Amino acid sequence: MSGMQTGPHAQPALATTVVADLDALFSVDGIKIPGPDARVVLVLDGHHTIKYHRLGLPAKPPASGKPVLRFEGGEHIAIGDNTLLRFSADSAPIEAWKVALHLPNGLTLSYGQIAALGGDFYGIPERPIADGATAQERVERFAAAFDSLAVLPASRDEAGRILAVMQREIAAANQAIKDGRQPHEAYDQLGDSLSEEWNKITGGGSFVSPMFPLGRYLKLAASNWDHFGEWALLAYIAGHTGALHQAMKARASGDVGQLELAYAMNAFADHFLTDLFSAGHVRVPRKAIKDNVTPADLGSLISRFMHDEDSKYGLVLRNAQGDTWRGYGDKRYFDTIDVANRKQIAEAVQKSADEVFQAFNTGTLPTPDSYGALRVAADLQAVVEDQVPGNFAPLFAMRNGKLMRRADVSNLNDQAQIDNWWGWSTYLLLKNYTPNKPSGYLEAPAAAPSIHADGWQTQVPSPPNWLPGHAVRYAVSMVNGLNESYIGPWSDYAELNDRFQPTLTVPVDNSGKSTSRHLFRQFRGGSPELIAALAAGTTTYIDHHQ
């Protein structure tokens, strides 16, 4: 548990601190320095990212990196709280959101809340889990990270304040869903506001900037390779191993409270597991960029551009079970295009939790190479080595021990790579770039489905949805294999008074780029749901779905 800072950090002397935008370095006037002892703090305003943390880049020493995006807290809560937990072989499983997990310091949290807090808000910034030299050391590092949430007394109040801010994120995403908008648009509107508050809650911020100095939240983000690729895999294995051993202790003691602790540890570990499904975390060589680009801050900074590309356009993923699907990245978990990825994540997290109970119930431990969740997770090597057809060219990649860059950074389809590139010049190319869309990208349709005025199938209501006083509307997306567009506009809501189950006219793709369409339905006040896959030539659909 050493290395955890819980109170306000000692503030640096700010009288000779100059805070300026990074781009001012490249302007005609430059940055005016008041004296030889002045400290320059460079900050960055968003150019392309949906949301990223605003972090100072000190002129010297370049010790910490630019935080890179991750699944948002609300997404982790939803993933974790939909999991089923068992406490007895004779009892039915319980939805995780109904289960209060009691931690040693008195905190009571749900599985999803712990998954949201793990790694992003709690951990030891200077001791990334995956940096442990051995499997045992990684388990020990995970335990220290978990204890920073579960054992430290100060976390009782702090975690509640973090979650209170996170609730605003959740409310914004929920409202977007009800409005029929894509939730990532809500995250876009929030900007950096929540990150500023989280930085202050975790000991950072000052009158100069809410993001300077760094609190634990931003320090963790600056060394967050535990959330990327092979490092996320190592972090999950360490945490899941620790949780399984805790389940064995619970079995030996017969204490259900000890099983709660095992589930809590596993929820913390599942944060890293779910990162293995976030496209912007799968193939970004996060640690290699940090280690090879000088200063390290700059390497962390340019990592985010690749993260954002992969998150926005998604990657084709495959796993050991033979599944192939397209997954998108942070802030897109609830978007209509990420349905297939949500199913894979849910399966992996459920397998992870089930193994904790199996260890408790049977007294046997699986070996790390047989962990069930890892058969569901993306095959990292296949994606990194471009063995999966359908993915656009990576911005950065390790090839034969060299850190390569896409030759034309603005062309997502440029497979040419170069090794003679520099961090600062690459940043200048990226900071205002407008990359083209990848091959196979499908534009959202311009028209909405329409309801036939005389096409209603019945006047008999049927619960839970086809009831008087309800209203329904429809939208469609274009599909070609694993490529799918965002949905087009929604039809107007049709009031359901004495008519139910309509007949629809569904727009077709006149461009010929799609081979099928997905039809979505939304009842007023509810969430959009995928109800049908339609062949390219089908123009009529009768909605008999409940």
Can you name each region flagged by the protein language model?
Residues 3-264, 282-439:
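N-terminal, motif-rich segments that launch catalysis or mediate targeting to/interaction with membranes
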